[in-house]
Amino acid sequence: MLTLLAILTVSYIIGSIPTSIMAGKMMKGIDIRNFGSGNAGGTNAFRVLGWKTGLTVTLIDIVKGVVAAVSVVAFFRHHPIGAFPDINEVALRLLAGMSAVIGHVFTVFAGFKGGKGVSTAAGMLIGIAPVSMLMVIGIFLLTVWFSRYVSVASIFAAVAFPLIIAIRKYVFELGGGLDYYIRLFGESFSFHDSLDYHLIIFGLLVAFAILFTHRANIRRLISGTENRVTFRKHA
């Protein structure tokens, strides 16, 4: 129990690192939550601080999720505080990753007002199912490129993840064929992709959570007032 508590606590602290807020202070001496959409995430960093800073913020937020789901769990597996928790490996990584996402959304370092957690959640899933997440990232990037709406891309990607896992597990894997080559591709890069059913359940919960946290964006999309991203450098 102490080991599980330590994993969740360390993951929460890592997730709580307020990347975009720190970037806003360093780059322009501002609190990014007072500009743009008012959100302390990578998307607003793109809008307010420019694409280079926005990309850096997004990548760091992704890394937070990877570290929580992979490195923190691995560390405490080798250095447990008492007995290591008897929990399914994928479920444990999901718990650690979600603790980081909660830290990102409710950061202890910035008055519990952080970002929406999309990038950190993506990082967690990259650490658990990298090949499936490559597909999701492809969907995300194509949607951003053609629509210029990060909110739409986030929603599409969130819905796509559990569908991809379910199709790979219950259609391609059972029937053989295509998923063998998908796995072979991943293993050629030392990617070990999980198709554990916990991921499908979690993916569905994340999809609903993303829809909930993007409800204001959805209202703006319907009214035609949602901000589009641009790829030009801001002054």
UniProtKB/Swiss-Prot annotation:
Molecular-function GO terms, alphabetical: acyl-phosphate glycerol-3-phosphate acyltransferase activity
Topological relation to the membrane, as annotated: Multi-pass membrane protein
Superkingdom per UniProt: Bacteria
One GO process term, biological-process aspect: phospholipid biosynthetic process
Subcellular location: Cell inner membrane
Record flagged with keyword Lipid biosynthesis: yes
Database matches in InterPro entries: G3P_acylTferase_PlsY
EC number: 2.3.1.275
Stretches that traverse the bilayer: 4-24, 56-76, 94-114, 126-146, 152-172, 194-214
Keywords attached to this entry: Cell inner membrane, Cell membrane, Lipid biosynthesis, Lipid metabolism, Membrane, Phospholipid biosynthesis, Phospholipid metabolism, Transferase, Transmembrane, Transmembrane helix
Catalysis: reaction(s): an acyl phosphate + sn-glycerol 3-phosphate = a 1-acyl-sn-glycero-3-phosphate + phosphate
Recorded metabolic or biological pathway in which this protein acts: Lipid metabolism; phospholipid metabolism
Cellular component GO terms, alphabetical: plasma membrane
Subunit structure comment from the entry: Probably interacts with PlsX.
Family of the protein in this entry: Belongs to the PlsY family.
NCBIfam families for the chain: glycerol-3-phosphate 1-O-acyltransferase PlsY
Biological function: Catalyzes the transfer of an acyl group from acyl-phosphate (acyl-PO(4)) to glycerol-3-phosphate (G3P) to form lysophosphatidic acid (LPA). This enzyme utilizes acyl-phosphate as fatty acyl donor, but not acyl-CoA or acyl-ACP.
Protein name: Glycerol-3-phosphate acyltransferase
Species for this entry: Chlorobium phaeovibrioides (strain DSM 265 / 1930)
Gene that encodes the chain: plsY
